[in-house]
Structures are given as structure tokens and as C-alpha cells.
Amino acid sequence: MAEAARDVWITGIGIVSSLGEGPEAHWQKLMAAQPSADTTTLAPFVVHPLAPVNFDAQIPKKGDQRQMEPWQRIGTYAAGLALDSAGVKGKPDILSHMDMI
């Protein structure tokens, strides 16, 4: 089965990690060579703990947050940041034609 050609547009970036939240925080820490590593809590293993995140900013319903595993909350939070970055959050006419990866 032949697949139709599709245009792909990257319109927003959502990133949260041990370096912080958003592209700017990441670039600043990467350029300054400021790793965020915890070498004591789970020694001898090095851990890069997630930066403090207010999940309420992207997942307003506490019930939704309670039903999610940590990885789901982080992914949903990052997706919300990407929608904010793209400027399409709260615009159903655009969101109804959009796929997220």
C-alpha cells in the first residue's frame, strides 16, 4: 500500500528535564556546561533528577494527574509546553487538524 506524501511542520517545542523547563533554560545550561546530576542519593549510580515542575500549569485537573503515571504527567506537561510554544493552545479549529509526536 502506497502512502500519501504529507507535509511535516514543527511549530512548537516542549521540553522538560533535569536542566529545566523550555528551550531557553536548556540552552543556557548546556552552553554553561552546568549538568544537573545527583551522585549521592542512589550511589554509585548518577541520577539526573527532573527540575521542579508545576503540573497544574499544563494539567489543571487534579483527578487527571492522579490517574497518570509519572512518565505520563511529564509527557503531557511537555506536550502542553509545545502547544504553548506553537501558540495554538485553546484553538480547537487548529488542534482538530494536528497530530503531536
Could you say what each language-model-derived stretch is?
Residues M1-I101:
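Conserved "HGTGT" condensation-loop signature of ketosynthase/thiolase-family condensing enzymes
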